């Protein structure tokens, strides 16, 4: 798992840094684990844009990923590591002894032939899944459930990992990638190890066209729009915002405004909030 930088022999390769895909062992996905995927293009059921800057991109087939790891006490073996266009992490095809095939997120450090198993009393090995109550303190985990039996919901991105830091009654404290410490029920399953392909953070698309291939459309600054299109728009030349602070296209405060609802049920499970990112001044990027 490495990255490949290009010489600037064209404008598009000047800043291009991509994965070398050396860990990929199979080009064709398992057909029995593919389903078609309707792309929303940022629209809701009424066709109204609810998420801007989405649309286009290459067609994709969705790979059915086993986030639940509910194949309990049945040994399996990784037979291939594949590319998934729907996520930055790699996926691994697992053959189980009873003949079933499933995809899982590829943990860092596994290879073709690595045995894996999920169950209550399984070895502490990378790729194995078990309840949090049976995982030793200090262990790195990923694909963590928030509701027992629902499947992993957090710590699934490429290179992500959480750490088991404490056990308190019916809960286990996890230190998440955001440095937030959160309590999770001890019956919830998690997978040992970190998600692979951590080098993706060092890649660079290199040109606007590659962003379009991924289904991302251009983002236009509000200050270069007309007043009818954005509160920052209008004026002669490069005019200031004309407000006390930057706002969204709908007039709501942006860039620093807290958006988390008060009195959420999960507040009681968060022992330490995530650390604040670097502060932005009022001269930051337009919303």
UniProtKB/Swiss-Prot annotation:
Cellular-component GO terms for this entry: large ribosomal subunit
Top-rank lineage group of the source organism: Bacteria
SUPFAM superfamilies per the UniProt record, alphabetical: Nucleic acid-binding proteins, Translation proteins SH3-like domain
Residue numbers spanned by region Disordered: 214-287
Alphabetized Pfam families for the sequence: Ribosomal_L2, Ribosomal_L2_C
InterPro entries xref list: NA-bd_OB-fold, Rib_uL2_dom2, Ribosomal_uL2, Ribosomal_uL2_bac/org-type, Ribosomal_uL2_C, Ribosomal_uL2_CS, Ribosomal_uL2_dom3, Ribosomal_uL2_RNA-bd_dom
Transmembrane segments: none
Example GO molecular function: structural constituent of ribosome
Keywords noted in UniProt: Ribonucleoprotein, Ribosomal protein, RNA-binding, rRNA-binding
Compositional bias of kind Basic residues: 271-287
Coiled-coil region: none
Record GO biological process: translation
Subunit structure, interactors included: Part of the 50S ribosomal subunit. Forms a bridge to the 30S subunit in the 70S ribosome.
Annotated function: One of the primary rRNA binding proteins. Required for association of the 30S and 50S subunits to form the 70S ribosome, for tRNA binding and peptide bond formation. It has been suggested to have peptidyltransferase activity; this is somewhat controversial. Makes several contacts with the 16S rRNA in the 70S ribosome.
Family to which this protein belongs: Belongs to the universal ribosomal protein uL2 family.
Annotated protein name in UniProt: Large ribosomal subunit protein uL2
Record gene name: rplB
